[in-house]
């Protein structure tokens, strides 16, 4: 079986599928599909070729010798981290900026098998009151914004005077107002969050902004993680290397419903939306989507940093990204993208609020009763993960599968949801003004 790479040279795998027939292989509907004679059973069908799916496909093939069919409904691997050269020859991220950062050495060690790294410390500025100032808020932000010359000690006192004491911190608004006061909340967070999430921060769970850093020194790095780098040749080549094992077959432009009718497999790893898998039985889980407008400009550089945020609600986009800052590419022109949040389109972000979590719990309970499938990733577990957290989750799921395989135990079909929280401890969760690691 050839790897379907939309006409490109099929460099992933060796273009062979598993050739033996296994009487234990199953199909959801028990009938042959039009694209396959059902003579090639797979140990695993992996749905989604982003981080969660690619890591598990690679580990199952290389670590346990399993045959894997990995599919994606899009025309490329890499999920939302996919990057490519645009018409001008500039490497861009099709779905907006993806900055790799982590405190987990085990995750760095794993991914380093598939890529070299380019050191990169991400910096973001916010367009506030007609000025570009660092975000997260730091000493420079405060001094520039207010025309002051404070020291770090004075800045701490400045923020303490403005912070509002609240009896309970329950929402995203509460988190920020209790830390920096209402004026800075309104300047930096309120409008941006309303645009990003389509909801007021007072309606969002406190987890959205619970780890927003505020600094009283001049550190203007967006992240404080010990490892901050970009794949030297890009994300797409890294994913290609991950999926190059001969036991892995890749099918693009392939919907899950097609694949489960057309192929034999023993177990499903599913990183798509959990509500979609169950045909929206309890209703749709709310997600935010994004629309990107990419442009190439006839100048070498547009802005001083890779990303500039626009918190003003009168500006319809949330930010502008200039990719050469991140990739280090030398080019006489520059490519940028405008980012517009949307209520419709591909699901990007689970919306964190109590009603949505209650709806997800109903799907989670249903998944726990469904044998033969493991739900992983941001969409499969309806949680807002960073890229490194998704890798950590996938490695933890694999470790469990490996342990059960070595001990002779059968995989736990009744335990279909795998968040693997211990894999998440090294990295903070997403924030309202964070750079999405989609």
Predicted regions and their residues:
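Active-site-proximal substrate-binding core of FAD-dependent oxidoreductases
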Residues: 402-425, 429-438
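N-terminal Rossmann-like FAD-binding beta1-loop-alpha1 element of flavoenzymes
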Residues: 44-70
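Glycine-rich, N-terminal phosphate-binding loop of Rossmann-like dinucleotide-binding domains
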Residues: 49, 272-273
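C-terminal segments that line or cap access tunnels to active or ligand-binding sites in enzymes
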Residues: 265-266, 276-407
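Glycine-rich FAD pyrophosphate-binding loop
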Residues: 61-87
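Dinucleotide-binding Rossmann-like beta1-alpha1 core, especially the glycine-rich loop
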Residues: 88-162
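Active-site/ligand-binding neighborhood in enzyme catalytic cores
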Residues: 129-267, 271, 278
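Extreme N-terminal leader/targeting segments of oxidoreductases
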Residues: 1-44, 62-65, 424
């Amino acid at each position: 079986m050839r790897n379907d790479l939309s006409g490109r040279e099929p460099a992933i795998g060796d273009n062979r599928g598993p050739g033996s027939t296994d009487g234990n292989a199953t199909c959801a509907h028990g009938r042959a599909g039009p694209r396959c004679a059902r003579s090639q059973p797979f140990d695993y069908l992996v749905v989604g070729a982003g981080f969660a799916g690619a890591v598990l496909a690679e580990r199952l093939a290389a670590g346990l010798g399993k045959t894997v069919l990995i599919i994606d409904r899009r025309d490329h691997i890499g999920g939302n981290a996919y990057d490519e050269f645009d018409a001008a020859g500039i490497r861009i991220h099709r779905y907006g900026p993806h900055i790799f950062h982590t405190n987990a050495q085990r995750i760095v060690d794993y991914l380093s098998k598939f890529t070299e790294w380019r050191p990169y410390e991400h910096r973001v500025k916010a367009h506030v009151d007609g000025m570009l100032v660092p975000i997260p808020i730091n000493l420079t932000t405060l001094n520039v914004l207010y025309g002051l010359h404070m020291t770090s000690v004075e800045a701490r006192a400045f923020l303490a005077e403005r912070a509002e004491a609240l009896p309970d911190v329950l929402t995203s608004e509460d988190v920020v107002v209790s830390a920096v006061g209402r004026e800075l909340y309104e300047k930096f967070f309120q409008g941006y969050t309303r645009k990003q999430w389509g909801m007021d921060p007072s309606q969002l769970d406190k987890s959205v902004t619970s780890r927003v850093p505020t600094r009283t020194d001049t550190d203007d790095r967006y992240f404080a993680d010990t490892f901050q780098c970009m794949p030297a040749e890009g994300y797409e080549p890294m994913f290609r290397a991950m999926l190059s094992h001969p036991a892995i077959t890749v099918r693009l432009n392939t919907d899950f419903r097609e694949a489960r009718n057309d192929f034999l497999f023993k177990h499903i790893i599913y990183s798509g939306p959990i509500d979609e898998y169950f045909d929206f039985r309890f209703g749709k889980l709310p997600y935010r989507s994004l629309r990107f407008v990419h442009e190439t400009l006839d100048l070498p550089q547009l802005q001083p940093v890779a990303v500039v945020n626009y918190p003003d609600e009168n500006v319809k986009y949330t930010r502008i990204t200039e990719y050469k800052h991140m990739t280090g590419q030398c080019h006489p022109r520059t490519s940028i993208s405008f980012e517009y949040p949307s209520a419709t389109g591909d699901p990007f972000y689970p919306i964190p609020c109590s009603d949505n979590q209650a709806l997800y719990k109903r799907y989670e309970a249903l998944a726990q009763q469904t044998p033969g499938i493991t739900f992983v990733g941001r969409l499969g577990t309806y949680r807002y993960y960073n890229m490194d957290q998704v890798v950590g989750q996938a490695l933890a799921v694999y470790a469990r599968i490996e342990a059960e395989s070595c001990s002779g135990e059968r995989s736990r079909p009744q335990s279909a949801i795998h968040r693997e929280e211990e894999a998440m401890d090294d990295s903070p969760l997403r924030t309202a003004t964070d750079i999405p690691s989609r």
